[in-house]
UniProtKB/Swiss-Prot annotation:
The modification Phosphotyrosine is found at Y354. The TPR 1 repeat interacts with the C-terminal of HSC70. The TPR 4, 5 and 6 repeats (also called TPR2A domain) and TPR 7, 8 and 9 repeats (also called TPR2B domain) interact with HSP90. The modification Phosphoserine is found at S16, S481. Keywords: Acetylation, Cytoplasm, Isopeptide bond, Nucleus, Phosphoprotein, Repeat, TPR repeat, Ubl conjugation. GO terms for molecular function: Hsp90 protein binding. Residues 205-233 have a biased composition (Basic and acidic residues). Residues 191-233 are annotated as: Disordered. SUPFAM superfamilies: TPR-like. It comes from the Eukaryota. Residues 130-169, 492-531 form the STI1 domain. TPR repeats lie at residues 4-37, 39-71, 73-105, 225-258, 260-292, 300-333, 360-393, 395-427, 428-461. This is Stress-induced-phosphoprotein 1. Its main location: cytoplasm. It comes from Mus musculus.
Amino acid sequence: MEQVNELKEKGNKALSAGNIDDALQCYSEAIKLDPQNHVLYSNRSAAYAKKGDYQKAYEDGCKTVDLKPDWGKGYSRKAAALEFLNRFEEAKRTYEEGLKHEANNLQLKEGLQNMEARLAERKFMNPFNLPNLYQKLENDPRTRSLLSDPTYRELIEQLQNKPSDLGTKLQDPRVMTTLSVLLGVDLGSMDEEEEAATPPPPPPPKKEPKPEPMEEDLPENKKQALKEKELGNDAYKKKDFDKALKHYDRAKELDPTNMTYITNQAAVHFEKGDYNKCRELCEKAIEVGRENREDYRQIAKAYARIGNSYFKEEKYKDAIHFYNKSLAEHRTPDVLKKCQQAEKILKEQERLAYINPDLALEEKNKGNECFQKGDYPQAMKHYTEAIKRNPRDAKLYSNRAACYTKLLEFQLALKDCEECIQLEPTFIKGYTRKAAALEAMKDYTKAMDVYQKALDLDSSCKEAADGYQRCMMAQYNRHDSPEDVKRRAMADPEVQQIMSDPAMRLILEQMQKDPQALSEHLKNPVIAQKIQKLMDVGLIAIR
């Protein structure tokens, strides 16, 4: 047994020095002499993992568990190898099995948490939570017109808050169109084989994680360093930061190759509010970690802490930069959420910083000049810039709506009119321009309603009175073909929703077969409202 211990110690020293092949030879010779020694298989598993031979690391991890089923380290070795092999579900189960035997084993707990995080990453990411969601939808002509429909926005919010509903919504063509825009692929053109294809396996880890240390067989200096770290952790929890720093500093002196002791020091300075020192130590820790091939998760934590320090100082651009560095090393939900939060704050800050009413007025005047010359596209650009400079000026939206109407972009005109009315409910132009857009779309019933609202505000408004009369006459004299009526009606998002409702389709079929059923259905105010809408657009008529 003395020879076995000598070979084991020799292997440990070789592994610590980075001489992996020598370490493997020592452990293998020791195993020949003592094939039932579980520690030897555990150590050799660590050596194989460090070499990158993860299959053999896994086999030795399994042997360790077989020889000593109640030893947490064996499960840790086996799970780590499975993780390297991208067999995340099996790794998770192995960590869970190990915790049944050693419920308080920190390595197993941390390993399980990391596995759960990585498995969460592999699930389908919800595209409806993109930070620039509405900008993407606005920029694409396939979804731009849908945004004016309140039911569409409700649908988007529902899928943002409850992505599990996506499967039940795929029959809605609007959802498929939206996914095509957000994912940048034409889902409608994918053939069955493409749709049924399984996703490609994830790429191998970008950096080789460092195998876990062999607690029982660590050199004396590393054992002492771990003890100092624990003392430092106890002091840190008690907020005795000076004492914690002393212990972490001592641990670093004993084991200068372990970046954890430096990041722990950085954590103390973070709590003390000394963010410059915190960042300096994190950078040093990353340097040490790179030199010693540290686990990429530890590198990611150091970058995330730098990001957090900038976030605390409200330097969101710098925070985003380091959060992205952290995510490039290892993606975790917490850091991703923090990065998105910083991006949202920064975007709002930039928007507010851009506001300048004086420059907005200049752009508005330029837009007016272009509009009078008939250069509507250029006028629209000036009004858009003016809105960015002063987004609370209702008249700017009204002016841009006039441009959109001239350019026959009626849905966008309606959207701007709605914004104008919301900002300034008593501004007549907001109503008359909205009504004009509806009139141009030949939606005379809605147009008359809006003209009437303008007249309610100012009964002497000639533009509203004339518009109301025009719409009334047009409605009376229209002789559209059934195809024209149907095409125009189905362009209305509200009508689309009504006609895609299975219950409403059943009611309409009943009305065709049994006209007497109408009176029963009209007792329901919701159904009555929908039937009235279909009558208004000319899709149905009641005789």
